[in-house]
Design a protein with these regions (language model features):
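Structural preference for alpha-helix termini/caps and helix-kink/transition segments
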Residues: 267, 276-481
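Short, glycine/charge-rich beta-strand/loop segments that flank catalytic centers
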Residues: 69-74, 95-98, 108-123, 141-150
Length: 481
């Protein structure tokens, strides 16, 4: 298999990826807390890891991908109380809404989407294990992790224990051994959901949930753990302490964190009230445009949100749709004549596919990978123009370009519906029919029968077929393709 280098947050270095089991990759990514509709910052890790999983499968890995839903949380409880509803109704509503957004952006399903509420026994067992091993202590009806018992606490975030309080989600309790100790289990409060436990009625703390669910599905040690860079501390730092404290094994080999979506260089977040809901963006822009926007830079880099960038993304999707349609036209033509132009097209296909792989092998750099896609699209347009000028088609060269572009775009997950439209078994007969219609229209124009020529154009337009008159002859395409 290809050698992939990834930037590991734990080591602060880019290193060669070595799977725990040859040919297999196990991945856990922290999902959303479903108390509201997802903003586009929440969509970034989903799209990022969708592409990573697609690429790993493409190069031959068997991938097991788990992404959770934190369906028991203060924000969900507060939302339910405010609406006079219950926590499960709220979480179900926004989980459904999350999947609608993911479907619009062609994000494939993870293998498992565990919910906290379905794994209470796993969580309770892990908390008890940490108590038994001296890493946790009971304080009233609460249970806390004693961070002084874990030697490597702070290794992921590069922080010292004394510096870890600023900006952290830490439970305040005067009886804690250390100010930075965090809740594993919280005693029940009036108006909140609760579960029975050895320490009384209560519910889990934020961090223990992901530790318990990831170990349950992927084992004590697995390959990749992902999420937004805002989760490095305290969430992922605490996951390491919990999981390794309980199992005695290394928790994760490679930690990958995506950068923020920013607005005017400030992080997009619901707490700052400077966010855009993904569902609202998708009312104005296609799922392909939003997906491409999220992939337009390498995942670790910040990505500044603007309408101008989304407008440009939409235009790029329209251009690529045209290129796919052009490839379809070329592939339907007969011919096997090698020319300098066809050899240039073959070379562009090979070089673009190679550049795409090199970009993805270098820490999944989709910014460079999309550049390879557009380089190939440009080469296809150049070849198409040459064919319009009378050059004979070389079907083999077109097929190589077709395969290369489709491979790249399948991995990026872009314009899948457009490819599906152009892959129907009736395409050749459809193309042949259109060639006849355009030939009749061209004859009418030569005979100055403009009314008939215009009527053909207008009727085709009404049927969703757009005619483009060029200096080298008429071309057609389906509207929206």
């Amino acid at each position: 298999m290809e050698e992939i280098k990834v930037y590991n947050t734990l080591t602060g270095e880019k290193t060669v990826f070595r799977p725990l089991v040859s040919g297999e990759v196990k991945i856990y990514v922290c999902g959303v807390t479903p108390y509201n509709h997802s903003h586009i910052g929440n969509a970034r890790p989903a799209v990022t890891w969708d592409v990573i999983c697609r690429y790993l499968k493409h190069i031959g890995y068997k991938v097991e991908f788990v992404q959770n839903f934190t369906d028991v949380d203060d924000k969900i409880i507060n939302k339910a109380n405010a609406e006079g509803s219950d926590w499960k109704t709220i979480s179900d509503r926004y989980i459904d809404a999350y999947f609608q957004v993911m479907d619009a952006m062609h994000v494939r399903r993870a293998d498992v989407y565990p919910r906290v509420s379905d794994h209470m026994q796993d969580i309770i067992d892990m908390v008890q294990g940490l108590i038994d091993k001296g890493h946790a202590y009971v304080l009233g009806n609460d249970v806390y992790y004693d961070i002084s018992t874990f030697e490597h606490y702070g290794a992921l975030s590069g922080r010292k224990i004394d510096d870890m309080l600023a900006g952290a989600r830490i439970e305040v309790n005067e009886g804690k051994r250390n100010p930075g100790d965090f809740a594993l289990w919280k005693g029940a409060k009036p108006g909140e959901p609760f579960w029975e436990s050895p320490w009384g009625k209560g519910r889990p703390g934020w961090h223990i949930e992901c530790s318990a669910m990831s170990v349950h599905y992927l084992g004590k040690t697995f390959d990749f753990h992902g999420g937004g860079s805002d989760l490095i501390f305290p969430h992922h730092e605490n996951e390491i302490a919990q999981s390794e404290g309980c199992t005695g094994c290394k928790f994760v080999n490679y930690w990958l964190h995506n950068g923020f979506i920013t607005i005017n260089s400030e992080k997009m977040s619901k707490s700052l009230n400077n966010f855009f809901l993904a569902k609202d963006v998708l009312e104005e822009y296609s799922g392909d445009a939003l997906r491409y926007f999220l992939l337009s830079v390498q995942y670790r880099n910040p990505l500044d949100y603007s309408r101008d960038r989304l407008d440009e993304a939409e235009k790029n999707m329209e251009r690529l749709s045209g290129v796919i349609g052009r490839l379809k036209e070329l592939a339907a033509k007969e011919g096997a004549e090698k020319t300098d132009a066809s050899r240039s097209l073959e070379k562009a296909a090979e070089e673009s596919l190679k550049a795409f792989h090199e970009a993805m092998d270098d820490d999944f750099n989709t910014g460079l990978a999309t550049g390879a896609m557009f380089d190939l699209a440009k080469a296809i347009n150049i070849y198409g123009t040459a064919v319009d000028g009378g050059l004979s088609v070389d079907h083999e060269s077109v097929e190589k370009a077709y395969t290369a572009l489709k491979t790249i775009m399948d991995i990026l997950g872009i314009l899948e519906e457009v490819w599906e439209k152009t892959d129907s078994p009736d395409d050749k007969s459809y193309n042949d029919l259109m060639d006849v219609i355009l030939a009749v229209r061209q004859t009418a124009r030569k005979e100055k029968m403009y009314k008939i020529a215009d009527e053909i154009r207008d009727r085709l337009d009404a049927a969703g077929i757009v005619i483009e008159d060029t200096p080298t002859g008429a071309r057609w395409k389906r509207r929206g393709v």
